[in-house]
Amino acid sequence: MLRTMMKSKIHRATVTQADLHYVGSVTVDEDLLDAADLLPGELVHIVDIDNGARLETYTIAGERGSGVIGINGAAARLVHPGDLVILIAYGQMEDVEAKGFEPHVVFVDADNRVVSTGSDPADAPAGSGLLRGDRPAGR
């Protein structure tokens, strides 16, 4: 049986542009694609932290070092410049691989520069003001 597992996550990126009249996709700084082990054309889910919108699209490589997170096409009606988003990609794997698989988790700053990377999907980097995803609030 194949299991669908989270393989890559860029957490709390800031949308830098949105263009309704584009053919679709999300443009992502190539440095972020590399850090998250994402390829151009790869399916990603986008979760908008500000308004709760969820959508799926594919990645396009943006200029390396630019910090670009560009929402293109119809998704620009849901996600806007300045919104915080999470980009998530999933992979399918057999049980044995899934049990030992370590995803690529990337946290960025307000300019979409990498501040930490790891493999723990519940991690909340020190000083981020976030809570770990596997602990009750207040602990």
UniProtKB/Swiss-Prot annotation:
Q: Which residues form the active site?
A: S25 (schiff-base intermediate with substrate), Y58 (proton donor)
Q: Where are the transmembrane segments?
A: none
Q: Which GO terms describe its biological process?
A: alanine biosynthetic process; pantothenate biosynthetic process
Q: Which cofactor does it need?
A: pyruvate
Instruction: Please name the InterPro entries in this protein's record.
Output: Asp_de-COase-like_dom_sf, Asp_decarbox
Q: Which molecular function terms from Gene Ontology are attached? A: aspartate 1-decarboxylase activity
**According to the UniProt entry, which residues carry Pyruvic acid (Ser)?**
S25
Which cystines does this chain contain?
none
Biological pathway:
Cofactor biosynthesis; (R)-pantothenate biosynthesis; beta-alanine from L-aspartate: step 1/1
Q: Which NCBIfam families match?
A: panD
Identification of the protein by name: Aspartate 1-decarboxylase
Organism this protein belongs to: Nocardioides sp. (strain ATCC BAA-499 / JS614)
What does the organism's lineage look like at the top?
Bacteria, Bacillati, Actinomycetota, Actinomycetes, Propionibacteriales
